[in-house]
């Protein structure tokens, strides 16, 4: 049975989708843009945007009753692969060395609201 996960500590969906769904022991988030849920604004720069996207992921997982250590796989969408290094530095700080999740990072032509980064995850309860 599928259960939608929703929290006010992450931005509301900007379309007809859930922040995340839980099915069985999996939690699958929608892509998280770097929207500050309190202000609706984007921070400046790739480092700050990466931090906000991952903070949003963390809030959604907390609503599901799990932490970042339960992430199995992330997908990082970048509007410019030249931002990979700066994104990677911030990304690493959200995980414990030696227990990083699997990850794909891809450049895309454009992200919603012209974000620099969007991050989605699959986690296990």
Explain the meaning of each model-derived region.
Residues 2-125:
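Short, polar/acidic, helix-capping and beta-turn segments at strand->helix junctions
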């Amino acid at each position: 049975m599928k259960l939608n996960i929703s929290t006010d500590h992450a931005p509301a969906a900007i379309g007809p989708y859930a922040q995340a769904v839980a099915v069985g022991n999996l939690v699958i988030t929608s892509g998280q843009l770097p929207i500050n849920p309190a202000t609706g604004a984007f921070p400046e720069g790739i480092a700050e945007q990466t931090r906000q996207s991952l903070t949003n992921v963390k809030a959604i997982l907390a609503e599901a009753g799990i932490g970042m250590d339960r992430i199995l796989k992330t997908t990082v969408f970048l509007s410019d692969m030249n931002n990979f290094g700066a994104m990677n530095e911030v990304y690493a700080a959200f995980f414990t060395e030696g227990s990083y999740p699997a990850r794909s990072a891809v450049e895309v032509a454009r992200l919603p609201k012209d974000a620099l980064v969007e991050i989605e995850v699959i986690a296990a309860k």
